Amino acid sequence: KDLPYFYGKFKREEFLKFSNVISKVGLEIKDISSFYFFPSGRWDIKFKDGLLLKLPNTDLINVLSKALLLKNNQNFLNSKIIDLRIKNRIISNG
């Protein structure tokens, strides 16, 4: 009933791999409104609270683990975008 929307053209294997990473870091599907897949092989996640998380196409377990910490960090509570595509950089609009 509350399944997220999916945007972009991706192979089933690509999503299954990404889904495995999501479950490993403890991300709840019920908190996600949409997934966006890009031709470069990377994903964005839009949460139901309005936050857009821009992910790189490598090191996803590590990056998603850090992203969840940032999402709940006081300094990022007003952020609508957290961009983690550049290694060792956090870009936020909040």
Per-region residue spans from a language model:
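Charged, solvent-exposed interaction patches on well-folded alpha/beta domains
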Residues: K1-G94
